[in-house]
């Protein structure tokens, strides 16, 4: 999904729901322009996608993977009720895999 900041009339990010690398789970991922950071817009958009995935799409859980060093992303995922499932080394850095359950 493309995320638009309505008040500013511009696209500011993307949220995606698709298969995770593990082949078992669906993953929510997101990217936002730095100008959109700190306004709660990513949280709002990811929350909508998670809600739809768990209700309308009928998924029993959704995961998200982010670098442990990305504290803002970790904080966002925790604020949505996601919990740390495990840590893995990937892409040359430690990643945390979060889950809705």
Residue ranges and their predicted role:
Residues 1-101:
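Acyl-donor (CoA/ACP) binding surface of acyl/acetyltransferases
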């Amino acid at each position: 999904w493309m995320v638009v900041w309505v008040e500013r009339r511009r696209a500011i990010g993307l949220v995606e729901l698709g298969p995770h690398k593990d082949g078992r789970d669906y993953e929510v991922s997101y990217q936002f322009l730095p100008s959109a950071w700190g306004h709660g817009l990513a949280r709002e958009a990811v929350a909508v996608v998670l809600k739809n995935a768990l209700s309308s799409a009928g998924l029993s859980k959704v995961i998200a993977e982010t670098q442990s060093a990305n504290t803002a992303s970790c904080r966002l995922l925790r604020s949505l009720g996601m919990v740390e499932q495990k840590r893995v080394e990937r892409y040359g850095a430690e990643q945390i895999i979060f889950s809705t359950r």
